[in-house]
Amino acid sequence: PSDVSKLDADDLLQGGSAVIVAGNVGGGIIFDVPPKDNDPANKDEDNDGIEDSKEGSAVVLTKGSAAAVQIGSATANTAIGPVAGTAAGGHGIVINGSILGDGAYKDIQGNGLVIGGLGGNVSVAGGMTVNGSVSASSNAANAAAVRLGSGATVPTIKTVGAITATGGSTATTLVRGIAIDAGASIASITNSGRISATA
């Protein structure tokens, strides 16, 4: 509800992130969807060992202030290697499905994908590709769809799909599609899809 005045403290307890990556991942991270059916005779067009008709579409959703997907650790450095296959372009993070961080209640920030910012360094091989969607929403609070925190090194962000943030309605709130914090490192951002922030 938009009015939380009648809710008890235990009703407003915050959950954690849906996905936390606090260790090294040599083969990269992919949030995938079934491939397009270009050849009806081929039941496994992406050659991943699973019949395409039996594959689902990745959806990661968090209600509350925690990031839907958090990559990094407070006590150690984290290295994300490249995802296999030419379609990944050598990138360590590929998002073909959807990620959403929804603050839900009034004054609770929303965070989609957060890399770094916890204390340890995070390196992502090649960068990241968004073919699907990464989004964040809030009710009168900050919202960031993608945030690179201090210590994050992501060579590039390639957006073919959508990175969107909605929320904040006051002069002090920040709504950002992509936020790059001090201490984060990125060489380029390319966009042939949509990157938006709406207050």
Question: What residues fall within each predicted segment?
Answer:
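Surface-exposed loop/turn motifs in large extracellular/passenger domains
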Residues: 1-199
